[in-house]
From Swiss-Prot:
This is Zinc finger protein GLIS1. Residues 648-658 have a biased composition (Low complexity). The keyword Cytoplasm does not apply. Pfam families: zf-C2H2 (PF00096), zf-C2H2_15 (PF23561). It is found in: Nucleus. The gene is Glis1. It comes from Mus musculus (Mouse). Residues 1-16, 63-74 have a biased composition (Basic and acidic residues). GO terms for molecular function: DNA binding; DNA-binding transcription activator activity, RNA polymerase II-specific; DNA-binding transcription repressor activity, RNA polymerase II-specific; RNA polymerase II transcription regulatory region sequence-specific DNA binding; zinc ion binding. GO terms for cellular component: nucleus.
Amino acid sequence: MHCEVAEALSDKRPKEAPGAPGQGRGPVSLGAHMAFRIAVSGGGCGDGNPLDLLPRLPVPPPRAHDLLRPRSPRDYGVSKTGSGKVNGSYGHSSEKSLLDLDLAEGPSPSCHQGLFLPAGTPPPRGHPPVCEKLLHFPHPNRSPRPQATFVNGSLPAAQHIKQEALPDYQAMVSAHTPLPTHCRAPSSMGLPSDLDFPDRGLTNPAPSCYLLGNEPISDLGPQPEAHLPEGSLKRCCLLGLPPTSSASSSPCASSDINPVIHSSQTALVSCVNGLRSPPLPGDLGGPPKRSRPGPASSDGQEGSLQLEACRKSGFLKQEPMDEFSELFAPHHQGLPPPYPLPQLPTGPGLGGLGLGLAGRMVAGRQACRWVDCCAAYEQQEELVRHIEKSHIDQRKGEDFTCFWAGCVRRYKPFNARYKLLIHMRVHSGEKPNKCMFEGCSKAFSRLENLKIHLRSHTGEKPYLCQHPGCQKAFSNSSDRAKHQRTHLDTKPYACQIPGCSKRYTDPSSLRKHVKAHSAKEQQVRKKLHTGADPEADVLSECLSLQQLQASTLLPASRGKGSQTLSQELLPGVYPGSVTPQNGLASGILSPSHDVPSRHHPLEVPTGSHHHLSPLPTAESTRDGLGPSLLSPMVSPLKGLGPPPLPPASQSQSPGGQSFSTVPSKPTYPSFQSPPPLPSPQGYQGSFHSIQNCFPYADCYRATEPAASRDGLVGDAHGFNPLRPSTYSSLSTPLSAPGYETLAETPCPPALQPQPAEDLVPSGPEDCGFFPNGAFDHCLSHIPSIYTDT
């Protein structure tokens, strides 16, 4: 470790004198314009040349430098050079004096801090890892009265100045670009690669890293951001930066740094607040001041810590402050506090406090948005007390101006203190005037509003209408003024909606009118939205007409079939409707049709119902429909015709898949007649199959001569479901003559299609399952079939 002596010129920064390597330099007496530099070489314990450190800071002009330093009553006299004792060590200071403590080490993480460069200046490169801090010492107070030292070892000024920026301070601050702090660590330390800044420019800022003399150096290694306690996060300059502390990792460097730390008894700061703008009058860029424990902080948590971002730049208005306001004044004179400082209680306005010149409101906290204050509190009462004591009671003379950020008064002063107090309730949200009536929880910031509200409970209406002949009274003058406009036919509140010329005497009526407009628009949108799907409406109407026609079709039918008609017409819609196999057939048959023996074979045990496929089930639909529905329209001979033929039109393919024996047919136009009844089993197939596959096949005509009553009866009792014949028989009721079974799949091309006149119409546009025209067409073929037998 060696010291270098530099001489500071009158109008420039102290220049670095050529350093002589080696240790054991004797004490050097520094003059008024001198500064010394302490450096630790990183290679070994005492050998090596001093490292080339970062370039020195540019010093502002003399006038600006005079404005930078803190003022006291003694500063207005002739400035003298002297020495002040800080924790046992002497330091020389003057207007231009500066103490630079440069700690450099090789492999350890380092901080390039304390730089205030103009906008556009690139960061310094090509320097070894160093950690440098510029410590600013104030002018010592030589008064015989003892001064109370702060925690960090600095001496306070004799008199504090309260600073308030003019309204244009934001524009002045925005003209400068802050240079964030930077920390760099070698890759061997295991830190993220994005912390290597010299190759990337300015990317990731780092917080202040403090070294405390009575703490071991090994505890101050680089720590991940996620593992820092909440208290440490609150003390990292309150600037939202990743709290990464840097310290020495070399034992030799640690042994050299410790004597320096203990000799000065002050906290050596490794990083400076880098989010500050270039130095302007009244702004030194120091870290925030912590409240000093003592009688002045008797209010406890109310004296919360001040943010550095709240110190405004620009031409400042200065007023003397009392002892209480010392807690809220910016403190530029002292060193920043040690990094871990557990002995000081953390103020409630610290955790999660938002940044910004005006002090942004944080969720769950009450923030003060006075122009030079960013204190925050947990409770609203604390904020109200803070505003009154710190910002209103401290004002002198007749100046009662609200400096709340964003206030609509725009710094227009009040002529009385109580008016400013009442006005501040608008910003703080305080409503001390509460309604005393039971069940009413309303509160008001102004007493006048509470009085008007109480009249709603008491019924008092002291404001009478002044129009002759009108006896109306009102509880407040504003309602009376609205009412009187009706007598004068004055309607200043007009509807702004295009096409509407309505006008009203009061704004409440206009608001109701605008709501009516919005309700009408919503109704129109709803109608347009519902009318955008006409197909759904057509389908619902079709289904409702189908049920209505079916319910009016069987007034003359008897039995339980008429009771369950609606369920059997649409078995797919009513899935729970399952009836016996021939219940409807036996129930809706006319008594004059004496065919007990012919319907006996149709009574299949219900236990075999699970063997039925959807196709024979639909086939049985027509077994009972022919004689029952058409009995009024055909002769007794036709009604007592031969029993139905065995089911046909089901052929087995070699793969075992069943196909219909009749190909798809063209369709006839739809009819408006009611559809016939389906079978008691209900339709188990698809709706599309019924509409498109209801053919009439010629295969029955080929088998008509061989059909006989006896053979059919005997065959019905002993038929084999798997017998090899032209028609695959299944254990289902026999089909009626002249009808074809339904098919789910397309018909094979084995049989020739029937002519158009022999086909049953069933178009996709038909609403019913079986249009009446289909039965009229089938009846024309029934006589030719029965007359041959």
